[in-house]
C-alpha cells in the first residue's frame, strides 16, 4: 500500500492535483485579462 498523508492522497496524486489547480488558475487569469480588456474597450463609461 502506498504511503498516505493526512489528506488521503499520495505525493504523486497531490502533485498531479496541484498541477491541475495551477493550470486552471492560469486559464482563469487569462480569460479574466481578456474580459477586462474587452470591457475597457467596449464600455464608454470606463474611458
From Swiss-Prot:
Chain positions recorded as a bacteriochlorophyll binding sites: 18, 36
Keyword Membrane: yes
Primary location: membrane
Cytoplasmic side: 2-19
GO molecular function, one term: bacteriochlorophyll binding
Spans through the membrane: 20-42
Periplasmic side: 43-47
Short name of any one Pfam family annotated for the protein: LHC
GO cellular component entries: plasma membrane; plasma membrane light-harvesting complex
Assembly with partners or alone: The core complex is formed by different alpha and beta chains, binding bacteriochlorophyll molecules, and arranged most probably in tetrameric structures disposed around the reaction center. The non-pigmented gamma chains may constitute additional components.
Function per UniProt: Antenna complexes are light-harvesting systems, which transfer the excitation energy to the reaction centers.
Protein name, entry field: Light-harvesting protein B-800-850 beta chain A
Natural source organism: Rhodopseudomonas palustris (strain ATCC BAA-98 / CGA009)
Name of the gene this protein is made from: pucBA
Amino acid at each position: 500500500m502506498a504511503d498516505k498523508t493526512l489528506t488521503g492522497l499520495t505525493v504523486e496524486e497531490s502533485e498531479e492535483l496541484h498541477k491541475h489547480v495551477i493550470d486552471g488558475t492560469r486559464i482563469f487569469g487569462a480569460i479574466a485579462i481578456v474580459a477586462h480588456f474587452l470591457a475597457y474597450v467596449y464600455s464608454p463609461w470606463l474611458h
